[in-house]
Amino acid sequence: FQVRAGGIPESPLAANRFPAGAVENYVAEEWSQVSNITVGAFRAPRSNFIAGAEQAFLDEVAEAAGKDPIDFRLELLTKAESKPVGTNNDYVASRYAGVLKLVKEKAAWSTNKNPDVFRGTAAYFCHNSYVANVLDMIMVKGKPVVQKVYCAIDCGIVVNPDAATNLAEGGLVDGIGHAMYSA
């Protein structure tokens, strides 16, 4: 269980961040990468990149294991709660699992098997909030088109629901735009 960060103050790469606590032999390394993606206007720029890399990797591991990507994450979170590896994880596994279960239900993940719809999922904990998404995409004239996004957020008590909705929707649009057009 080891983390090597690149010396960036307040790095989002943390020794106690998921999937820490759920897997043995965990190593996370951080380094700089030249990219054409601008970060000036990103919302929480360092966390976005870590989340994207982490979630893509978890999808690859789930696929290699022959497991559903949401169920795979839920298995890891169950292990992190019942038999944690290490101590002092900075997330609450049950809250993390809660947003995954909710987005799985709302998106009818297990039953929506339309072969023309490509689905993806991601979940992340950062800034004291748990977020899980399911994105449905179709191809139109050879180009990807986002059809629908499902989102579940557990950020604790929400004082201003409109502001929370605006932040979530703006973050989704920002992230989708960068993923589709900046890479």
Can you name each region flagged by the protein language model?
Residues 34, 38-104:
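N-terminal leader/propeptide and maturation segments of large enzyme subunits in energy/redox metabolism
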Residues 76-140:
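Helix-loop-helix junctions that connect adjacent transmembrane helices in secondary transporters/permeases
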Residues 1, 10, 101, 157-183:
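Active-site rim segments in enzyme catalytic domains, especially the processed small/beta chain
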